[in-house]
A protein has these predicted regions:
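Glycine-rich adenosine-cofactor-binding loop
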Residues: 66-108
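A structured beta-alpha segment of the ubiquitous adenosine-cofactor-binding alpha/beta core
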Residues: 133-169, 175-178
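Glycine/serine-rich phosphate-binding loop and adjoining beta1-alpha1 elements at the start
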Residues: 1-75
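Phosphate-binding loop/pocket of nucleotide- and phosphate-handling active sites
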Residues: 37-58, 278-334
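Glycine-rich phosphate-binding loop and adjoining beta1-alpha1-beta2 segment
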Residues: 106-144
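Adenosine-phosphate binding glycine-rich loop
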Residues: 198-294
Length: 453
């Protein structure tokens, strides 16, 4: 048949009494018997009302998808982080039937979590992953399930974590820390990764999405996001509120601070739909939604994602993307015929043994430049570095120096360049960090590292 429909009717009388009314039964000394001898048709049953009833069925995945307007089943996915944002995302996707999810989190529900989490007071002390899976089961009654893994998502050697990631087509980082996305970026065997977070005051949401082939990983997307914060006007207030915590946070993505749950749910709703759209894309994506809390309006900022390159520097790997090189080449060309230069902004992460270049600052106004030399000045430099740190919640700072060589010359370091590198290394040694020197030539780019042993 093309379709099958169910109908139900209610007769408001017990089954035995209905049998008597139909002439099928009779009662004797409070016991019911079949009436085999009665030949008279019974009519008492006609006095009973027959009421039509609606036939309802429990939702399965198909019904949930149809009711939610979801046309694609979604990927086999892993979500790392069952906190405020992660639990909201899973609730939205789970009820709409999108995706087949495993959630990884080692943390427990604490009393203060209840102001911005789907958990209830009865869940205090239970693991977040288990609670989220249980809440999903309560809503879906077995139509779909979320598999909880109580573990550290960064422990890729842990059997349950490794198995979950091996069976996934997509992993979404909602951990609110930097440790997981940076660690995942150096593992080639992992599936495509997205990272999502809400800014500390809840007024913005960020989606970083790797391309389908993982040529542009979360590591470089993070750096390019920071560069946009430093260079774009909207970056001035984007991370405001990161110092207003009541709980010590681990990064600019920590949301353990004073904020209404409504902001989490609003941003989660946007991210849930946008992630579904991003999964269908092959390219990388950096997208920011900035909300005006006074009027509720939202501005969307797209940052073009560009490739990165890795340069081995002894014990550290240096990562720099095409956007940095393009920026420095523009500054070089604008200064012709003179050389130019400035400071390099970025960050070190010794957990993954990396230094990441985010941007270069232009030459201070009191710099001295000629066609064959450059001496960087200091006017406004401290303020510029401080502003970059403020815009990125302290994530980006000074990592070294860059300068250009004149037209027609390569980036090969001169004797003077090597002397400068020694001075840089001695200066950075006070902080226990190596120094980076970047030289921009006509066609090439040289990066040198100096460290005091």
């Amino acid at each position: 048949p093309d379709a099958r429909r169910h109908r139900a009717f209610l007769v408001p009388i017990g089954g035995l009494e209905l049998g008597i009314a139909c002439g099928a039964l009779f009662v004797h000394e409070k016991r019911y018997y079949k009436d085999l001898l009665n030949q008279q048709p019974a009519t008492a049953w006609r006095e009973q009302p027959i009421l039509p009833m609606a036939v309802l069925t429990q939702n399965d995945r198909t019904a949930a998808m149809r009711q939610s307007g979801v046309t694609e089943e979604g990927p086999a996915g892993v979500l790392v982080g069952a906190g405020s944002l992660g639990s909201a995302l899973l609730n939205l996707w789970g009820r709409s039937g999108w995706g087949r999810w495993t959630v990884i989190d080692k943390d427990h529900i604490k009393p203060h979590n209840l102001s911005r989490h789907g958990a209830y007071a009865q869940h205090i002390g239970e693991t977040k992953a288990t609670v989220v899976a249980g809440l999903h089961a309560a809503a879906m009654e077995g139509a779909t399930e979320i598999v909880p893994v109580v573990a550290d998502g960064c422990d890729f050697a842990q059997a349950d974590v490794a198995q979950a990631l091996a069976g996934a087509a997509l992993a979404i980082d909602a951990s609110t820390t930097l440790e997981y996305p940076r660690a995942a970026s150096v593992v080639d065997t992992l599936p495509r990764h997205f990272s999502v977070f809400v800014t500390p005051n809840g007024n913005a949401a960020v989606l970083l999405a790797e391309d389908a082939k993982r040529m542009q990983r979360l590591r470089t997307l993070e750096a390019q996001y920071y560069r946009a914060l430093i260079q774009q006007d909207w970056g001035r207030v984007h991370l405001d509120g990161h110092a207003s915590t009541f709980w010590s946070g681990a990064s600019c993505r920590d949301i353990s601070l004073v904020m209404p749950y409504s902001r989490i749910l609003g941003q989660a709703s946007t991210l849930a739909e946008q992630i579904q759209a991003a999964v269908a894309r092959e390219d990388a994506l950096i997208r920011i939604w900035q909300r005006d809390p006074a009027r509720g309006g939202v501005e969307v900022h797209d940052v073009p994602a560009v490739p990165e390159r890795r340069i081995a520097l002894g014990e550290l790997d240096l990562y720099i993307d095409d956007g940095v090189e393009q920026q420095l080449r523009v500054l070089r060309q604008q200064s012709f015929p003179n050389e130019t230069g400035g400071v390099l902004l970025g960050y070190y992460d010794f957990n993954i043994k990396a230094v990441v270049i985010v941007a270069g600052l232009p030459a201070p106004s009191d710099s001295k430049a000629s066609p064959d030399s450059f001496e960087r000045g200091v006017a406004g430099l401290a303020e510029a570095v401080k502003d970059a740190a403020k815009r990125t919640a302290g994530m980006v700072g000074y990592v070294g120096e860059w300068h250009s060589h004149p037209p027609g010359h390569s980036a090969s370091p001169s004797r003077h360049d090597l002397v400068q590198l020694v001075h840089l290394a001695l200066g950075m040694a006070d902080d226990g960090l190596p120094a980076v020197q970047l030289i921009v030539g006509e066609q090439d780019l040289q990066i040198l590292q100096g460290a005091v042993q």
